């Protein structure tokens, strides 16, 4: 092996060792993605819902394109309700488990419970309706005005 290759390998190893002591940032979006995967029995990743229809993703408005999009509309409303309670739903982390019957919340504070419930209801909603690929990165945004 060439010395340059050894240096690169050493650099990668040192980086990984250093990063292992840094805890990952617990972001609600990451948790929501795992809840989605749990609810649909790991058939579809959570990021497939990040830019779906008119409501899945940031800034939802207009007429939902299908039932999955209506799930996102309801999730947006749930987050609005959480904000009215003084919660910060996009930043609130919570404890949950992925059980045989899907995800469920096991958390302590009022905001954690409320936000986790918003996410579990949305994840279960997604799992109960067919996913239509034509609405992923939906191009007919006129309908979303």
UniProtKB/Swiss-Prot annotation:
Signal peptide (from-to): 1-19
EC number(s) per entry: 3.1.1.4
Cofactor binding comment, as recorded: Binds 1 Ca(2+) ion.
GO molecular function, one term: calcium-dependent phospholipase A2 activity
Tissue specificity remark: Expressed by the venom gland.
Recorded catalytic activity of this chain's protein: a 1,2-diacyl-sn-glycero-3-phosphocholine + H2O = a 1-acyl-sn-glycero-3-phosphocholine + a fatty acid + H(+)
SUPFAM superfamilies assigned to the protein according to its UniProt record, in alphabetical order: Phospholipase A2, PLA2
EC category: hydrolase
Binding site for Ca(2+): 55, 57, 59, 76
InterPro entries from the UniProt entry: PLipase_A2 (IPR001211), PLipase_A2_Asp_AS (IPR033112), PLipase_A2_dom (IPR016090), PLipase_A2_dom_sf (IPR036444), PLipase_A2_His_AS (IPR033113)
Subcellular location: Secreted
PROSITE patterns named in the record: PA2_ASP (PS00119), PA2_HIS (PS00118)
Keywords: Calcium, Disulfide bond, Hydrolase, Lipid degradation, Lipid metabolism, Metal-binding, Neurotoxin, Presynaptic neurotoxin, Secreted, Signal, Toxin
Disulfide bonds: 38-98, 54-144, 56-72, 71-125, 78-118, 87-111, 105-116
Family to which this protein belongs: Belongs to the phospholipase A2 family. Group I subfamily. D49 sub-subfamily.
Subunit record text: Heterohexamer. 2 forms exist: 2 A or 2 B chains, 2 C chains and 2 covalently-linked D chains, and 1 A or 1 B, 1 C, 2 covalently-linked D chains and 2 differentially glycosylated covalently-linked D chains. Textilotoxin was originally described as pentameric.
Purpose: Snake venom oligomeric phospholipase A2 that has potent presynaptic neurotoxicity. Chain A possesses a very low toxicity, but is essential for neurotoxicity. Possesses a low enzymatic activity. PLA2 catalyzes the calcium-dependent hydrolysis of the 2-acyl groups in 3-sn-phosphoglycerides.
Official protein name in the record: Basic phospholipase A2 textilotoxin A chain
Source organism (scientific name): Pseudonaja textilis
């Amino acid at each position: 092996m060439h010395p340059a290759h050894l240096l690169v390998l050493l650099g990668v190893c040192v980086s990984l060792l250093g990063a292992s002591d840094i805890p990952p940032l617990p972001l609600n979006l990451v948790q929501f993605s795992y809840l989605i995967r749990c609810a649909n029995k790991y058939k579809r990743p959570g990021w497939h819902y990040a830019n779906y229809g008119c409501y899945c993703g940031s800034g939802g408005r207009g007429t939902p394109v299908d039932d999955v999009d209506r799930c996102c509309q309801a999730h947006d409303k749930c987050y609005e309700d959480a904000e009215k309670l003084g919660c910060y739903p996009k930043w609130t982390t919570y404890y949950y488990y992925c059980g045989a019957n899907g995800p469920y919340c096991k958390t302590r504070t009022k905001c954690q419970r409320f936000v986790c419930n918003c996410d579990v209801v949305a994840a279960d909603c997604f799992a109960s309706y067919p996913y239509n690929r034509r609405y992923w990165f939906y191009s007919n945004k006129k309908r979303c005005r």
